[in-house]
A protein has these predicted regions:
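C-terminal motif of bacterial Sec signal peptides marking the signal peptidase cleavage site
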Residues: 15-18
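An alpha-beta-alpha
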Residues: 58, 143-185, 190, 282-302
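Periplasmic-binding protein-like
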Residues: 92-99, 119-121, 213-222, 242
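Flexible loop/hinge segments that line or gate small-molecule binding clefts
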Residues: 111-135, 243-255
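Hydrophobic alpha-helical segments within soluble ligand-binding/sensing domains
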Residues: 134-154, 258-276
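Hinge/cleft segment of the Venus flytrap/periplasmic-binding protein
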Residues: 274-325
């Protein structure tokens, strides 16, 4: 089922799952507006992470830039390829794919529609009709690791990734580098769930790490990460969320979240395709662009000196003094 937004809808709540309403005068509006069609990540809406953040960006485009928005979830189409093909047939201004897991299918469909503009978030394509947008997740994870090291009493912290891949390893490497910048002797436990939609697996891995004395956990694992945050809360430990502010998942445990402004990526794509014709290339977003940052520190007794140290590290990133590889 196609999901479209009415101009009258100005509030988009996290966790939206039902079908949206059709715009007031669809025949007229479709002709006059640019249209963005998005295939959400495999977990879809309600992940309190990647897809929800993208939806926020789509809402901003619709509200401020007068774009017409359409999207698909895999629960409807059963495959990325079917979703991309369905949307490409509609000839929107741009078809957007979220996440590296859909890259192969996006590129397959993009080759079939060489005059259609596509965009890919979180991976890089070499095709002439695919615009790529990536993030410097290692920068934000560096700050997350520093915060974890400051908070940790056991000098052992944990990282749980959704799937071992070059993208998620950027989170891990940044986290480790930030932690050792604060405490060179800190121990960083690492596990991969190999699933972005398995909260129970996240909980299992979190409990195993906490048995090894990890008292701060960082999850870059989509919906799997919610199990990590909840497990940390149950044991009275701290956790760091990802992509969006995930405090609501475990209010007593989440001390901050590494914010990855996927909504900004969506609006950047809109601005780029609006400004010029068919294009490729790569847009890279980091701390300097306001696309990567930490949510406010909470549930942690940081001293003024420790908070200042975090700000210093952020400034060093802005000045190019810290480069996480």
């Amino acid at each position: 089922m196609s999901k479209r937004f009415s101009l009258s809808i100005l509030v988009l709540t996290i966790g939206l799952a039902g079908c949206g309403s059709v715009i007031d005068d669809p025949q007229q509006a479709v002709k006059e507006r640019r249209k963005m069609a998005v295939v959400l990540s495999d977990v879809g809406l309600g992940d309190q992470s990647f897809s929800d953040a993208a939806m926020s960006g789509m809402s901003l485009l619709r509200e401020k830039e007068d774009w017409f928005i359409d999207y698909r979830e895999l629960s409807e189409t059963k495959s990325y390829e079917a979703a991309f093909a369905t949307l490409a047939k509609q000839q929107p201004t741009v078809v957007v794919g979220l996440g590296f897991m859909g890259q192969a299918d996006l590129e397959k469909v993009a080759k079939q529609y060489p005059k259609q503009q596509f965009a890919l978030i979180d991976a890089v394509s070499e095709l002439p009709n695919v615009l790529s947008v990536t993030f410097k997740e290692d920068e934000g994870s560096y700050l997350a690791g520093a915060a974890a090291a400051i908070q940790s009493d056991s000098e052992t912290i944990g990282f749980i990734g959704g799937m071992k891949s070059p993208l998620i390893e950027k989170f891990e490497k940044g986290y480790r580098a930030g932690a050792t910048a604060i405490n060179p002797d800190i121990r960083v436990l690492v596990d991969y769930a190999e699933d972005f939609a398995a909260p129970d697996k996240g909980r299992e891995l979190a409990n195993a790490q906490m048995k090894k004395e990890a008292d701060v956990l960082y999850a870059a694992a989509g919906l799997t990460g919610s199990g990590v945050l909840e497990a940390a809360e149950e044991k009275g430990n701290k956790a760091i969320g990802v992509d969006s502010d995930q405090t609501a998942i475990a209010p007593d445990a989440v001390m901050t979240s590494m914010l990855k402004q996927v909504d900004l990526a969506i609006t950047k794509i809109g601005d780029s395709v609006k400004a010029s014709g068919l294009q490729s290339g790569q847009i890279v977003l980091g701390v300097k662009d306001g696309a990567i940052q930490l949510a406010p520190i909470r549930n942690a007794n940081f001293t003024a000196k420790e908070l200042h140290r975090l700000e210093q590290l952020k400034q060093e990133i802005l000045e190019g003094k810290v480069k996480v590889q």
